[in-house]
Amino acid sequence: MALLILLRHGQSVWNEKNLFSGWVDIPLSQQGIEEAFSAGRAIQNLPIDCIFTSTLVRSLMTALLAMTNHHSKKIPYIVHEDPKAKEMSRIYSAEEENNMIPLYQSSALNERMYGELQGKNKKQTAEQFGEERVKLWRRSYKTAPPQGESLYDTKQRTLPYFEKNILPQLQNGKNVFVSAHGNSLRSLIMDLEKLSEEEVLSLELPTGKPVVYQWKNHKIEKHPEFFG
């Protein structure tokens, strides 16, 4: 059996201001920092062998802060994709390498790209375009905001990345911690739980609250201790 821990990043500065963030690289707010520490305490006794985050700083901050509480005391280190950076950051101490946890970053796990809504206030946007249209942009499965992505579009990048990079880790018995975003995680959970296009629309993931699945009997299922 292996664990899959999914965590939406803590509150960002733009979450706090009720702005659309998308791919804009916004850090955590003070509350978000506290949420990351709290999430870390919730998973501190769970085994973790590798970490995956998006390329956005709020995702990375959440993972790093959460891991400060981990019982293993192991240090996350970023595994660079660029060959030169990977070689330049090589660890030559086997002892220290054993005390570290690899962390992989990919834009495939980034938040849904909100296009022309990015940086705009959510309430004011609803007043400008109408609540129904904005609700359609935000909550429908295949309708995207101007120049942005729908949840369907987001899934076209998150799911292939999951199947190529994360699923094999679980199949090899590795425990995986994924720190990402509301919509990138919703798109994955849609597949994990076999949710319909209608069912996924009501799926809400609060900031800083981990959800745990397990790889068991050749399939991913909800962990009974965390889903009750």
Swiss-Prot record:
<keyword id="KW-0324">Glycolysis</keyword>
<dbReference type="GO" id="GO:0006094">
    <property type="term" value="P:gluconeogenesis"/>
</dbReference>
<dbReference type="InterPro" id="IPR001345">
    <property type="entry name" value="PG/BPGM_mutase_AS"/>
</dbReference>
<feature type="binding site">
    <location>
        <begin position="21"/>
        <end position="22"/>
    </location>
    <ligand>
        <name>substrate</name>
    </ligand>
</feature>
<dbReference type="InterPro" id="IPR005952">
    <property type="entry name" value="Phosphogly_mut1"/>
</dbReference>
<feature type="active site" description="Proton donor/acceptor">
    <location>
        <position position="111"/>
    </location>
</feature>
<feature type="binding site">
    <location>
        <begin position="8"/>
        <end position="15"/>
    </location>
    <ligand>
        <name>substrate</name>
    </ligand>
</feature>
<feature type="active site" description="Tele-phosphohistidine intermediate">
    <location>
        <position position="9"/>
    </location>
</feature>
<feature type="binding site">
    <location>
        <position position="58"/>
    </location>
    <ligand>
        <name>substrate</name>
    </ligand>
</feature>
<feature type="binding site">
    <location>
        <begin position="111"/>
        <end position="114"/>
    </location>
    <ligand>
        <name>substrate</name>
    </ligand>
</feature>
<dbReference type="GO" id="GO:0004619">
    <property type="term" value="F:phosphoglycerate mutase activity"/>
</dbReference>
<dbReference type="Pfam" id="PF00300">
    <property type="entry name" value="His_Phos_1"/>
</dbReference>
<comment type="similarity">
    <text>Belongs to the phosphoglycerate mutase family. BPG-dependent PGAM subfamily.</text>
</comment>
<keyword id="KW-0312">Gluconeogenesis</keyword>
<comment type="function">
    <text>Catalyzes the interconversion of 2-phosphoglycerate and 3-phosphoglycerate.</text>
</comment>
<dbReference type="InterPro" id="IPR029033">
    <property type="entry name" value="His_PPase_superfam"/>
</dbReference>
<feature type="binding site">
    <location>
        <begin position="138"/>
        <end position="139"/>
    </location>
    <ligand>
        <name>substrate</name>
    </ligand>
</feature>
<dbReference type="GO" id="GO:0006096">
    <property type="term" value="P:glycolytic process"/>
</dbReference>
<feature type="binding site">
    <location>
        <position position="122"/>
    </location>
    <ligand>
        <name>substrate</name>
    </ligand>
</feature>
<keyword id="KW-0413">Isomerase</keyword>
<dbReference type="InterPro" id="IPR013078">
    <property type="entry name" value="His_Pase_superF_clade-1"/>
</dbReference>
<protein>
    <recommendedName>
        <fullName>2,3-bisphosphoglycerate-dependent phosphoglycerate mutase</fullName>
        <ecNumber>5.4.2.11</ecNumber>
    </recommendedName>
</protein>
<comment type="pathway">
    <text>Carbohydrate degradation; glycolysis; pyruvate from D-glyceraldehyde 3-phosphate: step 3/5.</text>
</comment>
<feature type="site" description="Transition state stabilizer">
    <location>
        <position position="181"/>
    </location>
</feature>
<feature type="binding site">
    <location>
        <begin position="182"/>
        <end position="183"/>
    </location>
    <ligand>
        <name>substrate</name>
    </ligand>
</feature>
